[in-house]
Swiss-Prot record:
It is an enzyme of class 2 (transferase). The active site is at 312 (proton acceptor). 3-phosphoshikimate binds at residues 19-20, 24, 164, 166, 312, 339. InterPro entries: Enolpyruvate_Tfrase_dom, Enolpyruvate_Tfrase_sf, EPSP_synthase, EPSP_synthase_CS, RNA3'P_cycl/enolpyr_Trfase_a/b. This is 3-phosphoshikimate 1-carboxyvinyltransferase. It comes from Bacillus pumilus (strain SAFR-032). GO terms for molecular function: 3-phosphoshikimate 1-carboxyvinyltransferase activity.
Length: 428
């Protein structure tokens, strides 16, 4: 796809439903007793993979666009799949599914695409094995395909070496099926969508700032879920509104969960002109309307605990930093190396092609601004949706046209991303 320099971005858009919450709404609805209705579901490729996996285990799921109805019969009624469970490109699906399957008394095999085959799973299979799950795979359970035979689990206390919502969620979902209490402690709090939604489904948890405990044997009761807009998707247009001259964009019903709003903190610190109007907190998840307009920005250091609250937004933050006066340093973000791509390397290589003054570091990157981006280059998403969208926004401020390869990757989390660019600028 070739994108030319655009006019100012102005308008009101509804950001697609949150990917993390959409995944969990299907998973928890599938293992609950009763019918769960989900509104504003994200019909992206990743979340559709989650639906497909549960259908293969006998769960009746109706999906029409952003509406999903899940007819759950409880954990014990999941059926042994006759085929492999293919998670596609979805790391959330495979890691949370492992937690569910760890306690199911049948055999299952999890596979994914080429990207998933390269992503490390030991960080999840390790604690699940401690609970008693039988999991095997390439490199002793490090890589897919993963073979799981669930069964009797016993609660554990586990200290996670990293703050990861996927590790935490997998352990809690296994702990739900274990004998006794399971406790997970992490270095600092990761996103808490699992805890919020389990509570919505009637599960009791014991939480403090860095740990969460769950008592095994609890059952989930069906409920209705409203999925707010995904702040990780909103981040692309928050940055666009900040750096495209003479722009003003309103983003409706965006999730404002405090464990996800690191991008808002960074924008404010850099001097962005951002207004927040909190609207509601349906389903335990706060959301509101965000208004962003063009402003002068300054470079900052981004490191420490905030990284886990904005890890998925770092590619677009890197673009933001190219248009800020001074140097922006991103540290403590080595987790980027094991995403859909090595996002440190891909962000640096692709932005350099456009003329950015950016360099990779061991655990992040250093960006010197303010730098006019030239464009006139061919860049690629390398199959990574967040890289593809970052490049789409970058092309809105380059002096020359930019050709982006593999733009289909954005369908994973934001199927109408380029349509929203077209609407806001009236040209693509």
């Amino acid at each position: 796809m070739k994108i030319h320099k655009h006019a100012p971005m102005n308008g009101v858009i509804h950001i697609p439903g949150d990917k993390s919450i959409s995944h969990r709404s299907v998973m928890f609805g599938a293992i609950a007793n009763g019918t769960t209705v989900v509104k504003n579901f994200l019909p992206g490729a990743d979340c559709l993979s989650t639906i497909d996996c549960f259908r293969k285990m006998g769960v009746d799921i109706e999906q029409k666009g952003t509406d999903v109805v899940i007819h759950g019969k409880g954990l014990k009624e999941l059926k042994e799949p006759s085929d492999v469970l293919d998670v596609g490109n979805s790391g959330t699906t495979i890691r949370l599914m492992m937690g569910i399957l760890a306690g199911c008394e049948f055999h299952s095999t999890l596979i994914g695409d080429e990207s998933i085959a390269k992503r490390p799973m030991q960080r999840v299979t390790g604690p699940l094995k401690q609970l008693g799950a039988k999991i095997d795979g390439r490199a002793n359970g490090e890589y897919t395909p993963l073979s799981i035979r669930g069964g009797h689990l016993k609660g554990i206390s586990y200290e996670s070496p990293v703050a990861s919502a996927q590790i935490k969620s997998a352990v809690l979902l296994a702990g739900l099926q274990a004998e006794g209490t399971t406790t997970l402690t992490e270095p600092h709090k990761s996103r808490d969508h699992t805890e919020r939604m389990l509570s919505m489904f009637g599960v009791k948890l014991d939480e403090d700032e860095q740990s969460v405990s769950i008592e095994g044997g609890q059952t989930l009761k069906a409920t209705d879920i409203f999925v707010p807009g995904d702040i990780s998707s909103a981040a692309f247009f928050l940055v666009a509104g900040s750096i495209v001259p003479n722009s003003r964009i309103v983003l409706k019903n965006v999730g404002l969960n405090k464990t996800r709003t690191g991008i808002i903190d960074v924008l404010k610190q850099m001097g962005a002109n951002l207004e927040i109007n909190e609207v509601d907190a349906k389903g335990g998840e706060p959301y509101g309307d965000l208004t962003i307009s063009t402003s002068s920005l300054k470079g900052i250091e981004i490191s420490g605990d905030v990284i886990s609250r904005l890890i998925d937004e770092i590619p677009i933050i890197a673009l933001l930093a190219t248009q800020a006066e001074g140097t922006t340093i991103i540290k403590d973000a080595a987790e980027l190396k094991v995403k859909e791509t090595n996002r440190i390397d891909t962000v640096v290589s692709e932005l350099k092609k456009l003329g950015a003054d950016i360099e990779a570091t061991e655990d992040g990157m250093k960006i010197h601004g303010k730098t006019p981006l030239q464009g006139g280059a061919v860049v690629s998403s390398y199959g990574d949706h967040r890289i593809g969208m970052m490049l789409g926004i970058a092309a809105c401020i380059t002096k020359q046209a930019v050709e982006i390869e593999d733009t289909d990757a954005v369908r994973v989390s934001y199927p109408n991303f380029f349509e929203h660019i077209e609407y806001l600028t009236k040209t693509v």
